[in-house]
Amino acid sequence: MDLRLVLVASPILLAVGWAGFNIGRAAVGQLQLMLKRARG
């Protein structure tokens, strides 16, 4: 594997992972809210 490729790919992977983590966390929060409302 080329070092330049790693240098280019790592920040992209980090950004994608961070975005996915935030989206997942928000989705879990929404699901919990929906469940609370459904139980009411």
UniProtKB/Swiss-Prot annotation:
The chain crosses the membrane at residues 5-23. One of its GO terms (biological process) is photosynthesis. Its main location: membrane. Pfam families: PsbY. Keywords: Membrane, Photosynthesis, Photosystem II, Thylakoid, Transmembrane, Transmembrane helix. It is found in: Cellular thylakoid membrane. InterPro entries: PSII_PsbY. It is a single-pass membrane protein. It comes from the Bacteria. GO terms for molecular function: manganese ion binding. GO terms for cellular component: photosystem II; plasma membrane-derived thylakoid membrane. The keyword Thylakoid applies. Disulfide bonds: none annotated. PSII is composed of 1 copy each of membrane proteins PsbA, PsbB, PsbC, PsbD, PsbE, PsbF, PsbH, PsbI, PsbJ, PsbK, PsbL, PsbM, PsbT, PsbX, PsbY, PsbZ, Psb30/Ycf12, peripheral proteins PsbO, CyanoQ (PsbQ), PsbU, PsbV and a large number of cofactors. It forms dimeric complexes. Belongs to the PsbY family. Loosely associated component of the core of photosystem II (PSII), it is not always seen in crystals. PSII is a light-driven water plastoquinone oxidoreductase, using light energy to abstract electrons from H(2)O, generating a proton gradient subsequently used for ATP formation. This is Photosystem II reaction center protein Y.
